Amino acid sequence: YDYITIEDDSQSSDQDWKAKIAADFAVGNEPDVIQYFTDANASDVLAANKLVSIEEIKKSYPNYAGDTLDSALIAAANPDGVERAVPTTGYWEGLFCNKDLFDQYGLELPTDWDKMETAIKTFKENGIIPIAVSLNNVPHYWIEFLMLSAAGPEDYAIVPKTAPEDWCKGLAMFKTLRDMGAFPVDTDTIDNDFAGELFKNKQAAMQLDGSWYAGGVPDQENTVVTAFPVIPGGKAPAGSMVGGISSGFYITKKAWDDPDKRDAAAKFVMAHTNKDAVTTYWGGNGQAAAKVDPLDDMTPLGISGLNYSSAATCISAPTDSRLSQEAYNILVAGIVDVSTGARTPEDLLNEVLQVNAK
């Protein structure tokens, strides 16, 4: 395409830039290809109805988005459920395990709830904290995975008016786990950094955290990431993951409907979203949206995180992506009381949802 010039107008994605993009789409000045948000941040651009769906593009280019994981395409779908953007990278949350502690006590990794309960009991009996967490500071990851596990991805993603039974069932596991002795005795007073040190120093066996946590773990050889085990009676499929993919490459109708630009636009996006390109964008950090190979310099923990995220059966966004900040703060602040039995999950969730509906 020696007759085509690519103009790169990349900028920081701040509010001013988002306003400029929305204005460009509104007045017919949109680009041919854009890497942009896929979530509610894209609402103004989506309202202009100037982006082509992947389904439409695949009719002419069957290999379009061909290297992209199905779970990543679904996660990058717009709020209306239509897949238009081809993502490159994202982040994941998962269960970090000190595998050497599991091996020391002859335990299997907690790939199902029976193994989780066995591990908690055995570690507690041997003076190892089963789960590093600060319930008063950052119970976020446990909120997400327990509710997702109980409700399944579809019901986890809704924003109801009153507390759903499955959400309550998920949060009730905080008390179950606390009663088992799964958490540090001072989980109500320590902060998240202290909880993280318990895991890193091998005083605790497990910790739920995000892909950003992996690089700070000192023992990259004996630490692994596993899928969160489904709680008893939970509706989530095994391998369900909390994570996020919030941007991707779009083709606009302006380029798609132009015979001189359609082929170039499609091949440009394919060049930036194939396995090799995604490997470059990803660089070993977070989640790769395509099935990539481990980098030569990746640690065993890095490879474990890659394998875990690539095998995810579904990717669900965190709870705070659907609730107002005020409502979410109330949810987080109420977890200690739920874990001690001082407050029921139903009572807490009804307050959260009532505030969220304001």
Question: What are the functions of these language-model segments?
Answer:
Residues 1-48, 59-65, 232-237, 347, ...:
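Conserved N-terminal structural module of periplasmic/extracytoplasmic solute-binding proteins
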Residues 23-24, 31-32, 63-100, 129-130, ...:
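A structural signal for short loop-to-beta-strand junctions that line the ligand-binding cleft
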Residues 120-123, 159-188:
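Glycine-centered hinge/linker elements that transmit conformational signals in sensory
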